[in-house]
Regions:
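Peripheral terminal appendages
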Residues: 2-6, 14-17, 208-250
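Detector for Asparagine
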Residues: 52, 66, 78, 90, ...
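An accessory alpha-helical subdomain
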Residues: 166, 170-172, 177-214, 225, ...
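Catalytic cores of RNA-modifying enzymes
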Residues: 1-184, 188, 231
Length: 250
């Protein structure tokens, strides 16, 4: 965090991390769903000498960034931040995937960097390598460069949760495909991962109603074994596969 940074924090809790961020950043906007905390926190921050923290009482899934026209149309809350803002979050496990998708895929204005604490299993999926890929892996690695930072054992929390957590950083990057080609990417990926135990050629053949031999040929063109499963392909191979399918099916 640099002195010129504006930070969006999701779920400040009692504000300990919020104040640490505010010591380094130009400003911090904290989104808090709990009405009691949202009422208490502004007074707490001012009493501690912080005048660069704004608390927004709202559900993060009902907030948009720099989209006032969408906010008005959809009755959402709009938050105005610089285009290079950074996001820090201790994400509730129940909304992790939905929340990550909103900020990665641009349903709200995308941050330049995300640092999130998530369930350890989710952190491993975000940063997975070929052989263990998933739809969430593709999402994170298409829109960002994710890095597994550190484990946070359950024993570090009170009350102690049932699972361990981990910290992941996601440096966002410009998508490499056009909007139309992205539709192809997610269509192929959804079909490909529809049955993880089946070979990818079987899933794509059945889902797209094309010959299995044709799919095998397409997989060979992206340097992949024809008996592979969806989780075996890297993000770059999925992107290449989009071009191969488009060239042969349009």
């Amino acid at each position: 965090i640099q002195p010129s940074d504006e930070v969006l924090e999701i779920g400040p809790g009692w504000g300990f991390l919020t104040m640490a961020l505010a010591q380094r950043a130009k400003g911090v906007t904290a989104i808090e769903l709990d009405p009691l905390l949202a009422e208490i926190l502004p007074t707490r921050f001012l009493a501690a000498g912080f005048h660069n923290i704004t608390v927004v009482h709202h559900d993060v899934l009902s907030v948009v960034i720099n989209r006032p026209e969408l906010a008005e149309k959809s009755r959402l809350a709009n938050i105005t931040l610089p285009s290079s803002y950074k996001l820090v979050a201790n994400l509730p496990y129940s909304i992790t995937s939905v929340c990550l998708k909103r900020f990665l895929a641009g349903e709200v204005a995308r941050p330049s960097l995300m640092v999130v604490m998530v369930q350890k299993e989710v952190a491993e999926r975000l940063t997975a390598k070929p052989g263990k890929m998933s739809l969430l892996s593709l999402l994170s690695q298409y829109y960002s460069d994710p890095h597994y930072i550190a484990d946070v054992p359950a024993a570090n929390f009170w009350p102690k949760p049932q699972v361990d957590s981990a910290i992941v950083s996601l440096q966002l990057k410009q998508p490499s495909l056009s909007v139309e080609d992205e539709k192809w990417l997610w269509r192929l990926a959804r079909i490909g991962f529809s049955s993880r135990r089946k070979m990818l050629k079987n899933n794509l053949s059945a889902g797209l109603l094309i010959e299995e031999s044709a799919v095998s040929n397409y997989l060979t063109q992206v340097r992949q074994n024809v008996n592979c499963r969806a989780q075996d392909l890297s993000i770059n191979q999925w992107i290449e596969l989009v071009g191969v399918f488009k060239n042969n099916m349009i």
